Amino acid sequence: EYARTMRVDEVVLALQERRNAMPVADLLRIRTAGVHVNEISTFLERETGRVDLRSVNPSWLIFSDGFSSGRRLSAWAKRAFDMIASGILLIPAAPVIGLTALLVKFDSKGPAFYRQIRVGQYGAPFTIVKLRSMRSDAEIVGEAVWAEKDDPRITRVGRIIRKLRIDELPQAWMVLKGEMSFVGPRPERPEFVDQLATKMPYFAERHVVKPGITGWAQINYPYGASLDDSRHKLEYDLYYAKNYTPFLDILILLQTVRVLLWPDGAR
């Protein structure tokens, strides 16, 4: 009666199902009256564009809709776009990469390109190649170190190419090879993956899609290197992995172009 009087369209259930705790009779009456009944995880996913780790549970991930990126048609369409777009991009990018490589060499000691092992789809390792933007002794102690905002290890040329995202242009070759996609979660180092997987749930599920040059987390969350930052970015990565569509990829690419034109959030 209250739902009808107040013209309620949706009821969001924030309770976990426990014996004698869920008002099943009331919910059934509301649902049969035409009111949509939703639970909190689905509601937050829809309203925030991320999977809320505080409310989600394994059964929700198993039984809710999504995770269609592995279907043959979706995977084929995404791969076809990646191959065509990366092939086209590499043609004008080649002279830019070459010129930038010379500037990197003149600016600081060390190689022009930076190679590093990253974790790809389904946990498979691959070698990522970027134009070097930090000093060659950035990790001289041999331990993986999180990059920081205004990191003092970044060179003069490195600061510019990071702001313009030129350092990431060589990754188009990884996309053409099929190790990466244009859109997907950020590829992390194995050391960081091992560390984060022990501290937050469902971290491995972000690897059901290929890592990307840009992604849903990158355009929705500012750069950060703390554990809390990683948790928030994981929520966006899980949303992308669960809700992938070609339209979502197009939206992310358009937002990435906006960031390139107005690079106020460059790391």
Feature-to-residue mapping (PLM):
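N-terminal hydrophobic signal-anchor/signal peptide
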Residues: 1-94, 267
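Proline-centered helix-kink/hinge sites
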Residues: 16, 41, 95, 111, ...
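Short, glycine-rich, amphipathic interfacial segments at transmembrane boundaries or analogous
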Residues: 41-57, 61, 114-153, 214-235
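C-terminal terminal-structure detector
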Residues: 68, 73, 177, 191, ...
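A hydrophobic, helix-centered structural microdomain
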Residues: 73-137, 174, 246-267
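Extended hydrophobic-aromatic, low-complexity segments
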Residues: 100, 125-128, 139-143, 169-173, ...
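A short, structured surface patch at a secondary-structure boundary
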Residues: 147-210, 252-256, 260
